[in-house]
């Protein structure tokens, strides 16, 4: 009997957080960005805040993140409890984006989408062996699938939370909406 063994799987957990008031949260994020100088890490244009893990208006989101990490870890099976290591917001105007990057040695990383206008861009995850997969298959596949795709696009959608391994390279496409900003909150988690 023949069978395929799926090895070295890369899980991406997603859930909709229905109990977050995104309209209010978006306003709080915009207000906060007017007082905080921010930083440049992977963002090309736009605003990226400094660490927000102790900012009061995010406390309910932090609680939801903790629950989601605990749920995701049932499959990951890491020892210990999830500890939020860092949290920051991203506000992306027209053509602003995030270059390919990863979150290093963090056990899990994630993003929560607060505001996502039409044409705001997707999040793109690269295969861990991106260069080899791209070279090996060199667009010779009939259809992209989990075995042959060098990258995978997932939608940026308000209320959606993604969790993924911190080592996974990813980027965010440019926001092509000329009038409304894309707002997301990203974070890193380790287990202890």
Language model features: what each stretch is:
Residues 7, 81, 102-106, 177-181:
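A generic structural micro-feature
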Residues 87-89, 110-112, 185-189:
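A structural signal for short, well-ordered beta-strand segments
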Residues 1-79, 97:
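Non-heme Fe(II)/2-oxoglutarate
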Residues 75-78, 96-100, 111-112, 170-174:
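Short helix-to-loop capping/linker segments positioned immediately adjacent to catalytic or ligand/cofactor-binding
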Residues 144-192:
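Catalytic core of Fe(II)/2-oxoglutarate
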């Amino acid at each position: 009997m023949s069978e395929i063994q799926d090895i070295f799987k890369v899980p991406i957990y997603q859930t909709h957080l229905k109990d977050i008031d995104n309209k209010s949260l978006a306003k709080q994020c915009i207000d906060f960005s007017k007082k905080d100088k921010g930083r440049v890490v992977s963002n090309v244009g736009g605003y990226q805040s400094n660490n927000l893990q102790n900012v009061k208006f995010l406390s309910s989101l932090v609680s939801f993140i903790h629950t989601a990490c605990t749920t995701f870890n049932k499959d990951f099976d890491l020892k210990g409890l999830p500890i939020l290591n860092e949290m920051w917001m991203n506000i992306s105007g027209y053509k602003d984006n995030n270059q390919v990057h990863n979150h290093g040695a963090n056990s899990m990383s994630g993003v929560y989408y607060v505001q996502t206008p039409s044409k705001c861009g997707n999040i793109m995850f690269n295969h861990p062996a991106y260069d080899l997969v791209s070279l090996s298959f060199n667009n010779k596949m009939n259809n992209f699938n989990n075995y042959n795709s060098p990258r995978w696009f997932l939608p940026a959608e308000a209320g959606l939370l993604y969790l993924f391994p911190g080592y996974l390279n990813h980027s965010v496409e440019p926001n092509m909406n000329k009038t409304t900003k894309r707002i997301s909150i990203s974070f890193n988690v380790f287990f202890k």
